[in-house]
Amino acid sequence: RGFWRGVFFYPVLLSPVVVALIWKWLLQSQGVFNAVLVSMHQTPVEWLTDGRWAFFWTIFVSIWAHMGFYTLILLAGLQAIPKDVYEAALMDKASPWRTLTRITLPLLMPNLIVVLVLAMIRAVQVFDEVFVLTGGGPGSATTFIVQFIYQTGFAEQIHLYGLAAAASLALAVGLIALTLLQLKLTHAKEAGQKVR
């Protein structure tokens, strides 16, 4: 049990740059994944230079790197559910599905909302993994908003500071809106009110 917690949480302890470098090593043209494909007499795949694959792997690496943190939040929520509630459901002969949908998920909802909002905020702010894995390419396949701000304001020959500042402001407003939504959902759930 402790081993699996460690396995899930370990990537959170690593720097996003280190995580991206490990995955870049695995996914590069001469990397481990292609070596396995070649050993099975398959054609190697350009994981990071094909737009579709690069987009998928960028998202996967970002999610994988933070999954342990989200799992920890959900595990804390599960452990906070009183055992008496499950015992009462067992005495009432509630099916496992009914126990899940009527007890576990409703009591876990505040934690699920926090995880959802944190994951959305992290998804919007992803930069390190993209910068190390693909640099925003191929083309603009993995250019997310923070990468766009960086490229527009600092990396290009012509620095478009106004456009980068406008994109930064839009990002800040979006993140504030997500945070306010999370607060509203959490407070409405705690008060037992219906969210409008």
Residue ranges, per PLM feature:
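A structural signal for multi-pass alpha-helical bundles of membrane permease subunits
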Residues: R1-R196
